[in-house]
Each structure stands twice: as structure tokens, then as C-alpha cells.
């Protein structure tokens, strides 16, 4: 799920055997412009859990800051408890280390690119899940 401002969101679903390398490259190159809104991509991820991804967790990758209203966070926490999913944040904060405060209210684990290289983050995430 690619996201930017509240009106910019694009969902790419890659099911086994139903996508090409070019599809993945196109997704990797997606840029929707500036702005950051966390609510819409989180809502999209939860909706995907209703259509075949019911045992999924969310990996939330961002370089931005966004405050979510407390009532939304309460609803999100209820969804997390009911569906038993976790949200792992990956914060692209190499230019401004320590800016985790907008991920803290809804992520169970936060990795910072200012502290770990990309491959270290992947190894850590995989070792926790396997």
C-alpha cells in the first residue's frame, strides 16, 4: 500500500504466480507526491484482512510524521486485539534520527534506518517471525 497525503493511496497485491518482476519494479518506483497520512493506508491494510489476508501483520514503512486522533487509535487497537495482528514500523529517519513518536502509538516494534541497515532490519524481522 503506497501512501502520501489523505487523497493519495495505491494498493498493489502480489499473489504467488500472479505478478511479474516488472509489476514489482513498478510498485517499487511508485511515488504519490508529498504529504503523509497514516489513517488511509492503515484502513486499507485492515480491509485487505477481510479479503484473504486474515492472518497478516502490517509492516509500516514511512519517512514522515503524522498524528492520529486518539479515537482512531482506540479503534485501531480494538481491531488489533480482535484480529490478532501486529504493526511493525520501519522509520526512514537517516536524516533525523529518533523521530519515532508518530509511530509509537500503534507500532509494536519500530526499526530505524538511522540505527540499522536495511538488511539488518530484514534479518531481525524474519528471525522474530520464524
State where each predicted segment sits:
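Short beta-strand-loop
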Residues: 1-28, 48, 98-102
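VWA/integrin I-like adhesion module and closely mimicked acidic/polar interface patches used
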Residues: 29-36, 64-115
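Generic recognition of flexible, low-complexity loop/linker segments
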Residues: 45-48, 75-76
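Glycine-rich phosphate-binding loop signature in dinucleotide/nucleotide-binding domains
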Residues: 49-54
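C-terminal "exit" segments of structured domains
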Residues: 117-130
Amino acid at each position: 500500500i503506497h501512501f502520501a497525503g489523505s487523497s493519495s493511496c495505491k494498493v498493489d497485491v502480489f499473489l504467488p504466480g500472479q505478478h511479474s518482476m516488472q509489476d514489482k519494479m513498478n510498485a517499487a518506483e511508485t511515488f504519490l507526491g508529498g504529504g503523509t497520512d497514516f489513517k488511509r493506508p492503515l484502513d486499507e491494510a485492515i480491509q485487505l484482512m477481510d479479503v484473504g489476508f486474515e492472518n497478516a501483520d502490517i509492516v509500516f514503512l514511512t519517512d514522515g510524521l503524522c498524528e492520529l486522533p486518539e479515537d482512531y487509535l482506540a479503534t485501531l487497537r480494538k481491531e488489533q486485539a480482535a484480529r490478532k495482528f501486529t504493526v511493525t514500523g520501519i522509520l526512514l529517519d537517516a536524516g533525523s534520527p529518533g523521530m519515532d513518536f508518530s509511530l509509537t502509538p500503534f507500532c509494536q516494534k519500530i526499526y530505524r534506518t538511522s540505527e540499522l541497515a536495511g538488511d539488518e532490519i530484514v534479518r531481525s524481522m524474519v528471525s522474530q517471525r520464524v
